[in-house]
Amino acid sequence: MSLLTEVETYVLSIVPSGPLKAEIAQRLEDVFAGKNTDLEALMEWLKTRPILSPLTKGILGFVFTLTVPSERGLQRRRFVQNALNGNGDPNNMDRAVKLYRKLKREITFHGAKEVALSYSAGALASCMGLIYNRMGTVTTEVAFGLVCATCEQIADSQHRSHRQMVTTTNPLIRHENRMVLASITAKAMEQMAGSSEQAAEAMEVASQARQMVQAMRTIGTHPSSSAGLKDNLLENLQAYQKRMGVQMQRFK
């Protein structure tokens, strides 16, 4: 896996699924291929995107700034600076300075990532902030190692909270989680269907699932009633994907 492919993989792991994720993936590919060289326009586009957390926007802004050639005096963007300030916690800033000193001694992507992984996401974001604000300089490869370590910490935390959600014993939480997952799967089916001739069935299944979830939320039902909802949807999606010759990896 090339360095830029690895960076793209890690960055996209913290972006919520949906049409915006596909759009961001395309922008990253264009930037890494040298096809998009207008940093100002890119940053303005990023700033106004919905759904993304401030930290995710900050990380993407940092990656764009590292990659797109720009005039030396180009002004730094406030939304990126605010996102990469470690929540204003002085402890994060102290750790960021210590990490920065270690990163200065690193020359490889993997070396930098390994060093950075022992720090919290807050300290890592602060360290990115130091570099973004030109208070310190490291090689692009080392900066990318820092980016990927930060994304890994965030993705691990999201994964842990997802696992806790799945294994929780509270039936009301599990019920709501099943409905949320069913809605997400329905959305995935609609996105995959597009305008193909075989799409009618997938759209119909997705539409029925949405109506069922809406009805459950509106009138209230027993928590066990949603147990098969997500599984039925996934089975329908898998059957549809087999017919379309699409692999199931994205929506497991």
Curated annotation (Swiss-Prot):
Region (RNP-binding): 165-252
Intervals of motif Nuclear localization signal: 101-105
GO MF annotations, alphabetized: RNA binding; structural constituent of virion
Keyword Thylakoid: no
Main location: virion
Keywords, alphabetical: Host nucleus, Membrane, RNA-binding, Viral matrix protein, Virion
GO cellular component: host cell nucleus; membrane; virion membrane
Misc note: Most abundant protein in virion. When expressed alone can form virus-like particles in transfected cells.
Function: Plays critical roles in virus replication, from virus entry and uncoating to assembly and budding of the virus particle. M1 binding to ribonucleocapsids (RNPs) in nucleus seems to inhibit viral transcription. Interaction of viral NEP with M1-RNP is thought to promote nuclear export of the complex, which is targeted to the virion assembly site at the apical plasma membrane in polarized epithelial cells. Interactions with NA and HA may bring M1, a non-raft-associated protein, into lipid rafts. Forms a continuous shell on the inner side of the lipid bilayer in virion, where it binds the RNP.
Name this protein carries in UniProt: Matrix protein 1
Originating species: Influenza A virus (strain A/Turkey/Ontario/7732/1966 H5N9)
